[in-house]
């Protein structure tokens, strides 16, 4: 149960009502992370716009890479809400490539629980390593970390976009945990 009051859709007015309606149009529901931000509609609006841009906008990073990074960051932060949410989104993206539901679930489980043993290609391994380091020890980041990604074939735009995804999920993980966002009941858990 959330630790602050959530303004319900039926009670929402103005900008909040428009944001809720947009969420329903996009996802056929209002996610709990959206409703937890109901106390400040302008922040909700800007946060959701940033999310849509970094996760669905043009990028040299694939959708599956962005979802993988989101899952790794959420796992490093032990943020159950976002681990479940983005492991589920990662499953959707990876299923397009792997085509075997059992192998897909196992891959997603590995990314969420122990990404270092998920059998990643060297570039994706380095991307996850970068995400975990920036999440857990941001003061230790150096130019060498970026050079390593560039040497593996990532463009500067890809590195920039990775930093955006990593930073956003550190921000939104903290909102979910600090305000006790309820888990979504309709997300199939990779833990089953």
Question: What are these model-predicted stretches?
Answer:
Residues 1-192:
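Hydrophobic alpha-helical segments
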